[in-house]
Amino acid sequence: MKNHVATFCICIYYEILVPLQRLSIRQMTPYELAYEYVMHTNRSIFLTGKAGTGKTTLLRKLRVECPKQMMVVAPTGVAAINAEGVTIHSLFQLPPQLFLPTPIERKKLFAEMQMRRPKQRLLRNLELLVIDEISMVRADLLDTIDAVLRRMRHRPNLPFGGVQMLFIGDLYQLSPVAREDDWNYLRPFY
């Protein structure tokens, strides 16, 4: 894990800090580097670490200081409250179901989706989407978020419709919740 952090830090150093003439990489924590990365690029990032390593502190700092149009979502109500955000299903007006990544299922989802204009406008103007507790998000739900953003933003060729994604979570904590039947449906796709 330590080598991955070092590699990540070096990549950020040459991509962001050198051009910006910021602090030396030795003077910054990985979370300070992640903050600079989110603030000064449009690239997506996965931020992980065990409890107490600064993930929530980074999120709070971004809420206050980030000039980007930003939304924070989480897979459950409790996680959304803790992150001061909303649930994924609420933001994207998704029913509580499996989302198989087939053309027929996608067409059906979009036909049934009824999103009010303010929410459509919010998604079209969105620049940064933070998903907290990402370890609890099933692959089909993440694919659906991608499909909805591509469609709503009229950018079908860009991942997540061109929205910068910040995935926060610890993959060693909670895993996605699904019944055995659900996993049987999802297994051929994921």
Question: What positions do the PLM features span?
Answer:
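Conserved ATP-binding/catalytic motifs of P-loop helicase motor domains
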Residues: 9, 13, 20-190
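Polybasic, lysine-rich low-complexity intrinsically disordered segments
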Residues: 2-3
